[in-house]
Amino acid sequence: MTTLAIDIGGTKLAAALIGADGQIRDRRELPTPASQTPQALRDALSALVSPLQAHAQRVAIASTGIIRDGSLLALNPHNLGGLLHFPLVKTLEQLTNLPTIAINDAQAAAWAEYQALDGDITDMVFITVSTGVGGGVVSGGKLRTGPGGLAGHIGHTLADPHGPVCGCGRTGCVEAIASGRGIATAAQGELAGANAKTIFTRAGQGDEQAQQLIHRSARTLARLIADIKATTDCQCVVVGGSVGLAEGYLALVETYLAQEPAAFHVDLLAAHYRHDAGLLGAALLAQGEKL
């Protein structure tokens, strides 16, 4: 059975056909609509899936935000155009006439990345550092989503009580500091208004402020990982996302994690499926019908 997998992120929408063998084909991307309206997202999703839907028997969605009862609740509305209570499952069922499931994108990615690990690992955490910071937890060989879909939203844990206000409404969240948006927001002077990709480029060219911003992000993530080790005793942490997979970033995180007491050290791995983990994880979960 072929799954039409969809990944809804803060900057892009992706879709692909995924067979029972896990092979990804006919992958397509569109920018996430800048307009803060449900109709804009519906129209973009329609354009994305229309060339693919005839070749699939079901739909699996991985989306940023909390997924509850098939609807999207954007914990940080800034990451998805201010959408709240968007009926993801209902919308895709109407567009495709196919049975549909939905799950948080980082939770989906965690499940895909777990499948790529050695068989003796039963407990792992996936962290995505991209437009925002998200995560997924596998414990005892099972994906933990929680009764309300909140499990794994580790980007909204405290990093600095005196830090910037996060889009979720809390102060000093990891996401507000370590994410691509957090890096860009903190930029000043000639870097003001630059996005995270530009800041990474400037850091590689020796720009001191850019390097400091990236170190701040990596240090914040390392402290989060130490906290995760303390709370889950996971065997490894897998890091993905456009920031997490940026050249040199994971090595910086490892350097800062090494400064923590040894009890909080844990193996860090780069995401095996890189930017396709959400798509694949959603398809795998649809195959297992575990949602």
From Swiss-Prot:
Residue stretches in coiled coil: none
Claim: Ribonucleoprotein is one of the keywords in the record: no
Catalytic activity: an N-acyl-D-mannosamine + ATP = an N-acyl-D-mannosamine 6-phosphate + ADP + H(+)
GO molecular function: ATP binding; N-acylmannosamine kinase activity; zinc ion binding
Pathway annotation from the record: Amino-sugar metabolism; N-acetylneuraminate degradation; D-fructose 6-phosphate from N-acetylneuraminate: step 2/5
Function: Catalyzes the phosphorylation of N-acetylmannosamine (ManNAc) to ManNAc-6-P.
Subunit and partners: Homodimer.
Family (UniProt): Belongs to the ROK (NagC/XylR) family. NanK subfamily.
Descriptive protein name: N-acetylmannosamine kinase
Organism name: Escherichia coli O6:K15:H31 (strain 536 / UPEC)
